[in-house]
């Protein structure tokens, strides 16, 4: 039996690149309606064009800090994917806003989920909860070494989910996403990801900038794989559990930069600058066994293939935007 077939599902932050990709997969799996609650600060309506072609998508422009907006969005749905959050950089710049979104906003979602008898919540956490590694690879029992407000908010979210499960038997799973990349990344926002900045530089014939020695490592996971994990978490019997979502592969910024230059066909060399202190975690690599065992999920898009797909999407998106501006679309 397909538990998604014919259901109504809410995605907070659903116009973002993870939320919108999850919406695509939910509609492919037979969801009758996908609701999107998004304030469109980071999310983009373009990201939902594919989903709208697949099925019934209802977009509610609203903020998870607004209790009425959340309650109206949750009413009548079977499941909730809670993706709405702030970037780690924004949390550092605006601590009060971070608390309001990550804590108060999540509280609104959970309260409404209980009130309207939601069957399960699938929540976005982050590998940021781990901070600097005590050991590698990081499993789900790794200590919380986080020293960022964003990570603190995600730890609090996990504990809130656990408490609501204990108090109200609200089923949930939470995913500690590692370093997500892929189509629908923010290509023109204030806080563009390092990959997008590098692609912009390469396109302009300028060397991509690496801040620090380039030995900082991450575990990159393709957005389609992340969305598959989300869906797997919904349909699985697992509840009151957290899972890593990564490839289980450690990639340094140096390696990432040279791979991007390679797939871009560029002969440029990276340019090194003094390290910037925003998130100074030196290494990340996930263990993936728990998700494989309990959810049957394993990420399968390797980094080089994913980078090629990202570049193709970026070129297509820029072409479409240029055509729209030129009035030829």
Predicted regions and their residues:
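Conserved C-terminal active-site "lid" loop/helix of NAD(P)H-dependent oxidoreductases
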Residues: 223, 276-298, 302, 309
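N-terminal Rossmann-like NAD(P)+-binding domain of SDR-like oxidoreductases, especially those catalyzing
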Residues: 1-180, 301, 317-320, 327-329
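C-terminal "lid/loop" region of Rossmann-like NAD(P)-dependent oxidoreductases
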Residues: 213, 242-243, 251-258, 265-283, ...
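A short C-terminal helix-loop "cap" of Rossmann-like NAD(P)-dependent dehydrogenase/epimerase domains
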Residues: 54, 141, 168, 196-210, ...
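Non-catalytic, hydrophobic alpha-helical segments
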Residues: 80, 226, 230, 245, ...
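Conserved mid-core alpha-helix of short-chain dehydrogenase/reductase
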Residues: 69, 108-112, 220, 225-228, ...
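Glycine/proline-rich active-site loop of Rossmann-fold NAD(P)-dependent oxidoreductases
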Residues: 155, 180-196, 206-207, 211, ...
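Hydrophobic "lid"/C-terminal helical patch
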Residues: 22, 230-234, 257-260, 307-314
């Amino acid at each position: 039996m397909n538990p998604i077939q014919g259901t109504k599902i809410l995605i907070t932050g659903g116009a973002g690149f993870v939320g919108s990709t999850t919406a695509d997969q939910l509609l492919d799996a037979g969801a009758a309606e996908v609701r999107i609650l998004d304030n469109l600060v980071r999310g983009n309506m373009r990201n939902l064009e594919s989903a709208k072609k697949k099925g019934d998508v209802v977009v509610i422009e609203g903020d998870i800090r607004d209790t009425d907006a959340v309650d109206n969005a949750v009413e009548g749905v079977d499941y909730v994917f809670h993706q709405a959050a702030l970037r780690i950089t924004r949390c550092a710049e605006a601590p009060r806003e971070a608390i309001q979104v990550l804590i108060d906003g999540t509280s609104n979602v959970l309260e409404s989920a209980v009130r309207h008898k939601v069957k399960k919540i699938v929540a976005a956490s982050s590998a940021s909860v781990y901070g600097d590694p005590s050991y590698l690879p990081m499993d789900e029992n790794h200590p919380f070494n986080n020293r960022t407000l964003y990570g603190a908010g995600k730890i609090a979210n996990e504990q809130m989910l656990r408490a609501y499960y204990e108090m109200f038997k609200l089923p949930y799973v939470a995913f500690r996403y590692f370093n997500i990349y892929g189509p629908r990344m923010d290509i023109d926002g204030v806080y563009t990801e390092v990959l997008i900045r590098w692609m912009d530089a390469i396109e302009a014939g300028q060397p991509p900038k690496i801040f620090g020695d380039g030995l900082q490592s991450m575990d990159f996971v393709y957005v389609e794989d992340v969305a598959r994990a989300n869906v797997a978490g919904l349909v699985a019997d697992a509840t009151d559990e957290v899972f890593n979502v990564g490839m289980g592969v450690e990639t340094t910024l140096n390696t990432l930069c040279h791979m991007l230059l390679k797939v871009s066909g560029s002969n440029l060399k990276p340019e090194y600058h003094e390290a910037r202190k925003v998130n100074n975690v030196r290494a990340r690599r996930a263990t993936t066994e728990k998700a494989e065992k309990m959810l049957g999920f394993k990420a399968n898009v390797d980094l080089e293939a994913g980078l090629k797909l990202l570049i193709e999407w970026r070129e297509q998106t820029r072409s479409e935007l240029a055509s729209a501006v030129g009035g030829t679309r």
